[in-house]
Curated annotation (Swiss-Prot):
Its job: Probable transporter.
InterPro entries given in the database record: Ostalpha/TMEM184C
Gene name of this polypeptide: tmem184C
Family named by the database record: Belongs to the TMEM184 family.
Annotated segments matching region Disordered: 327-351
PANTHER family per UniProt: ORGANIC SOLUTE TRANSPORTER-RELATED
Name of the protein in its database record: Transmembrane protein 184 homolog DDB_G0279555
Coiled-coil region list: none
Membrane topology note: Multi-pass membrane protein
Record field: transmembrane: 1-21, 39-59, 73-93, 127-147, 162-182, 206-226, 241-261
Lineage: Eukaryota, Amoebozoa, Evosea, Eumycetozoa, Dictyostelia
Amino acid sequence: MWIVAGVCSGVAILLSFYLIYKHLRNYTNPELQKYIVRILIMVPIYSVDSWLSLRFVELSLYFDVVRDTYEAYVLYCFFSLIVAYIERDFDLVELLHSKEPLPHPFPLTCLPKIKLDRGFLTNCKRFVLQFVFIKPIVAIISLVLETQHKYGEGKFQVGTGYVWLTVVENISVGLSLYFLVLYYKAMEEELKPFKPLGKFLCIKSILFFSFWQSIAISFLVYFGVISPIGSWSVDNISSALQDFITCVEMVILAICHHFFFNYQEFRDPHKVPFIYDKTTKTFFNNPKTNITPIIKNFFTNVTNISDVISDTRETFILPLLSPDHHHNHPTTKKKDEESNLLEPEDKDIII
């Protein structure tokens, strides 16, 4: 089984590395492509992690911490990608202020409509970003509980850590996806040229399948469908089964990435690729097409997580230190004053 999984992982990694190379070779829009490359890296990470977990099943929980952490990071990268796409052509806050209040999607249509302003954007960032922290924390707690034999993977019993951590993770990812959908609905018209739906389904599919696969396998364990075989315990078999399925799925996802995250839209004969200068934190045109700038772009721009730190500071730390931070922001203050002057008072539409 692990040999078949290894072949699938190898194919998925080769397909992904080729697409990553092509994006870095045609790095004409760094602000978008850095997020795209980060998303594409998900396939190699998942493939290697799942194969290692399958090959060394006793250590699978340790390997999964890396995979779970990157899974949450990819969701944040997709949100940042569609924000960056809008900011390329519009002042995002001004655009939000020009729109009508947004109704909640079904089945929450009974809730008050959402006023679109900087506060809405901050809330979207906050709820997407919280998953980036909750997911690895849940993974680490799972690891600690497993070492104490209190995790009980696949056991739907109140006394096991598995049940409670699954609930916490489900709530966290649900909120993250919900606010991602809210932003998408608010910007649906402006995002149409970017064709975000296929890209979003690529991201959501891995979150959906990885989570519900584990739940489905846990039910199989609970009802006795999966039983011990030789030296392999039920936990070993259920973990190996999920890792094997993931290795196969990565081939499909890597192929989908070639359609939905294609580099061709960034291939412009009238533009030369950019290269990132870490010292000045700016991009400059790079007339060369050798491997050096490709490596440089990857290690100095794609792997630079300063945007995560900045968003964390903006959405979590500053509001705690200064509750009036949002209202004191110059753009927000100006827009709020304009809204008070130009818009009729309607308390039901603000949340």
